[in-house]
Structures are given as structure tokens and as C-alpha cells.
Amino acid sequence: IEAASGIVVCSHGNARAVVPSDRNFPDEVLKAVAQKGGVCGVAGWPPFISTNNRPSMDDMIRMIDYMVDLVGIDHVGIGMDYMHGQAGTVSNEDAEALYEYLVDSGNWSEETYPAPPWYYPEGIELPSTFFNLTGALLVRGYKKEDVAKIWGGNWLRIMGEVWG
């Protein structure tokens, strides 16, 4: 991050202080991304958002809250990471086959990536229910302008700055 001459992003970068996964980032990394003007995208992939196999909407909001408090509203976005293999989209057998392939190929480790089923946070389990995050953020007390930043406004700002 220090060597970068411009904006840096963590497209799927949750806080390790909230969920101690090797894939989540320490606070100092998230702060460094923000100091470069970047955005950290909160991922909803179950093991990165909660230690519970069935995360709740509150788990997702708690991660967003922590990151907004840490780096500021202008540096938090969504990097949901919906994927083939998640519960509700394929059979358990297909999810297991995908997992075995990813582990056997060396792309994933069993220590960092638990075996399926992978249940996304309650209320936003599938892309078709993802809109429910808006209401949850508003109920939590976020202003409409801030929800718009989290949903994509911060990513659009970066695209404009990087690509003009």
C-alpha cells in the first residue's frame, strides 16, 4: 500500500478485529487503504462475516458499522462475494464438489475456508434478496446519503478518480 502512487482498494476486505479470519484484514491495513483514498468492500461470505455458520443481518451490519467507525463512511463499500456453491443456489453435493476442487487445486485452504454449506447472512441470502440491506442500514440509523455511498457511491467516486 505504501508503494502505491494512487488509490488502493480492498474489494473484499473485512475487519479481522471483528471476525478473526486469515482472509480478513488487520485494522492498520484498512486504515492505510482509506489514507490512500480507497474503499474497503465488506464481503458477506459467511466465514468472513461471522463465526456462526448461519450469519445474521446484524452480523453484516456489525461489520459495516465497525469499518465505518474505523475508516469513515467515504471508505466503505460492498464487495458481497456471492458465489456459485452458496446454499440455495446449488445442491449440497455440487457445493461439496466445488469445495474439494478448490482445496485440492491449492486455491483454498481448509484452515481459511470451511466446508459447505455456505449460508449468506439472513435476509440477504441470495442476490435476489440483497436489496434488504438498504432497509437494515436505514433502521440502524444510516442516512440515505451514506447508504448510497456504501451501496456504490464510493466505488463510483474511485472509478471517476482513476479512470476520469
Model-derived regions: residue spans:
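Histidine/acidic residue-rich metal-binding segments in metalloenzymes
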Residues: I1-V9, D22-G38, D58-D74
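Active-site-proximal loop/turn and secondary-structure-junction residues that shape catalytic pockets
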Residues: A4, N14-A15, G44-F48, Y82-H84
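Sec-exported extracytoplasmic/periplasmic mature domains
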Residues: S5, A34-Q35, D65, D69-G72, ...
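Conserved, mostly hydrophobic/aromatic
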Residues: H12, C40, D81, V147
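Active-site glycine- and acidic-residue-rich loops that bind
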Residues: N14-N24, I49-R62
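A conserved active-site cap/scaffold subdomain adjacent to cofactor or substrate pockets
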Residues: A34-M57
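Short acidic/histidine-rich active-site segments
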Residues: G44, V71-E96, E100-G123
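Mid-to-C-terminal alpha-helical segments outside catalytic/metal-binding sites
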Residues: Y113-G164
